[in-house]
Amino acid sequence: MADEADPGELVAHARRTAFPRVDRERDRLAWSWSELAALEPRGPWALREPDPKAAAAAWEDIQLVVVPGLAFTERGDRLGYGKGYYDRAIAAARSGTRAPRFVGFAFEAQVLPELPMQAHDQRLDGLVTEAGLRWFI
């Protein structure tokens, strides 16, 4: 989304990067290995996503997931866009044998004292803003 903090520089330093795409058939996020330059606007929201034919990435092979959001708290709470894609992805990854770290990426102005949380909402492991990195684990 245009008003989110841009993780492009962070991605540029990664050795290997998996990006999410919305799997509309299964109503979930799927992760594929791709280069940042190869992402193209796709789907109803025109989000930059990898080619659906790109090699799938397994949770066991991913070390860190950058998670977008509208707002965050100092406890790792996150307010997303209401579709639950990241909450379901985080829950699925954490149910496996080895899950990556899930870290929010935002502007400091998006960090609030409190957010409404529901039973299905997943807390993040950390948060990166222009003020630095906070770990919640």
Regions found by a protein language model. Give the residues of each.
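Short glycine-rich anion-binding loops that position phosphate/pyrophosphate groups of nucleotides
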Residues: 1, 70-72
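Surface-exposed, charge/polar-rich loops and edge strands
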Residues: 52-65, 74-78, 87-137
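Short, conserved beta-strand edge motifs with alternating hydrophobic and charged residues
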Residues: 18-21, 67, 105
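N-terminal active-site beta-alpha-beta segment that forms phosphate/nucleotide-binding
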Residues: 1-61
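A structured binding-face within diverse protein domains that lines the active/interaction site
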Residues: 48, 68-70
